[in-house]
Amino acid sequence: MLKMNYWTDKWDLHEDICPCDVHFNDWTDAQKVRGKTIFHFGTGTHHVIGVKQAEKGNLVYGITASVEEYELYIKLVTENAKVAKNYLAYFGDIYLTNPRLLPEFDVVTMFHLCEFFFPNTASAEYGGMTDRQMLDLFTEKTRAGGYLLFYPRSIAWDRAQAVVAQWEKERPVERVGEFKTLLVYRKR
């Protein structure tokens, strides 16, 4: 039996190195995002998107492949019922996502596209998707008029950029601009 691919490390908030989660929260403030459903790829130990968006009344589904990040989520929601009601983080490999388990989203973050792909991820034996297939899945799960956001300073942007460029040509999306360090697309 194959084990699930997961990350053996964790990510604390280092805004000077990777400000994407903080900039996302700023973007939602600027866009007045309220009462929306958000999918967030890569929670970090800080859970700043889940916490702030939950407090604003948005619903957040977050995924982490880090045991430590998930354990901190459990501690967080155990101590904060309001956050627990509006923020659901799960531990898993995003490349194994089953679309039948997901609702539709108004906003999707793809800040870590191409960062966690293992050599066996898309193999028939493991059953995972490629980064492009995963991006297509979340595009399908994004409502018309919804947003997909990327982080061009990602450690894997050299690979993700090509995936995004091809995706932009083939999917019903349009680039609407940049916000601080984020690249923003809207689904038509």
Question: What function would you assign to each model-found segment?
Answer:
Residues M1-K32:
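Class I SAM-dependent methyltransferase Rossmann-like catalytic core
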Residues V33-H46:
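Conserved class I S-adenosyl-L-methionine
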Residues T45-N58:
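Conserved SAM-binding loop of SAM-dependent methyltransferases across substrates and taxa
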Residues L59-A65:
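Conserved SAM-binding motif I beta-strand of class I
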Residues V83-I94:
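Conserved SAM-binding strand-loop segment of SAM-dependent methyltransferases
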Residues D106-G128:
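A short SAM/SAH-binding and catalytic strip from SAM-dependent methyltransferases
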Residues S123-A144:
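A short glycine-rich, Lys/Arg-flanked "PGG" loop and its adjoining helix->strand segment in the class I
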